Amino acid sequence: MKDKIISLIQKEKNISGYRLITSKTKSAEMFFIKEKLDMNRAKDVLHASLTVYRDFEENGKKYRGSSTVKISPTMSETEISEKIADAVFAAQFVKNEWYPLAKPTTEKAFKVKSSFDTDDLNSEAVKVKNAIYKNRKTKAKLNSAEIFISNIEVQIVNSEGVDINFKSYNGFIEVITNCSIGTEDVEIYGDNSFASESEKLISEMISEQLRETEERANAKKAKHLNSVNVIITNKAVASFFRFYISQTSASMVYKKSSRAKIGENFQGENIKGDKLNIKLIPNMPNSPMSAPYDSDGLLLKEHTLLNNGVVKTFHGAIRFSHYLGVEPTGSIFNFEVEPGKLSETELKKEPYVEILTFSDFFNDPVTGDFGGEFRLARYFDGEKIHIINNGSISGNIFDAQKEFYFSKERTQHTSYLGPKSILIPNMEVLGE
């Protein structure tokens, strides 16, 4: 398929460059109602994505247009040629400043390791199922579960001579739990992504979700609190820290949507709490986003974004890095945040609201505004813990970063590895 597409590309006179990505995906899928298997299926599919580039000049300035099309392995040569012609035609209407394509390298790439590197993905799905349906003593129950396991063989070829192959892996589960011990039934949806079978990770996720389902069944509506320590946990932590990934991206800097400047402290002066130390890690164990190359075919390496709050580098794909005149890191989606010095127990010495689940945690990558309504939280008033819901918080990261504290304990959520909790002092909690 690759050779056929490239031979047809070379017949087009108006193409200045191209990038072809082919991916062969093998997967196993299982669907359960309670503990009963409802459906079990496997897939083996091939996809191709072709981007063509078309260069032109206006008033002495170089521009590069591009257009991407999907090509199916069932297409005839005539159909593929028509697709290519459509892409070439569309590319002339895209007017981006010129940028280069990735070039070949002799450096050796790492190999992602995974238990999903096997032809027997069904057995891996069974292991995941066993971790989900492990016996637990709880009043909340598992209502249903869906399991998706896949390995993907990727090849990237471009007109500059790049021709690389690598494998990536993805596991994904969706679980619905319910509990009927309160005044009304409670149902909670949870999901998780991973890149290798991990009984510990999956078992902990299910146990925590069952516990939270039971707590939510007994939760009372939150009261208004003018000032209290707020502890953000679970997936919202990853979303909170992702703000810094956005602010240090070359595209945000180029578009003047970022305050980040190389060599300057992003947190400002006189920081009272923990300082930010963030790295991009292309080969993070058990992350489905781990890959030795990005979609441009650029070799990926580890990079430090912030060191004690100081911006060390901007990151991103070739295009915007070229516009800024910085060395491209490539598109790396895994990031690691250094934990703090205090344990979760130490963070909870004073009264606090620990938010476990948001309805929809928002985080504006430009303004730094964050918050949302929470579905479940634990409020410690100094004497006892109250299970609460239907409250909300709002704040701004540019203000919060002057004094926030990270837990010593770490956790991983897909492509995030870092503190399990963040404490932000003196926040207002809206409620009744």
Predicted segment positions?
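A generic local secondary-structure boundary/capping motif
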Residues: 9-10, 37-41, 129-136, 159-167, ...
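Short, acidic (Asp/Glu-rich) active-site segment that either coordinates a divalent metal cofactor
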Residues: 57-65, 173-200, 268-269, 311-333
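N-terminal alpha-helical targeting/anchoring segments
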Residues: 26-89
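Structured beta-strand/loop patches that form or line metal/cofactor-binding pockets in enzymes
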Residues: 16-49, 144-164, 295, 351-372
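Extended amphipathic alpha-helical scaffolds
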Residues: 31, 126-205, 251-277
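Dual-mode signal for accessory low-complexity, basic/Gly-rich regions
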Residues: 265-432
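Acidic low-complexity segments
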Residues: 4-7, 16-28, 77-166, 201-238
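Short beta-strand elements
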Residues: 46-58, 164-194, 305-307, 374-381
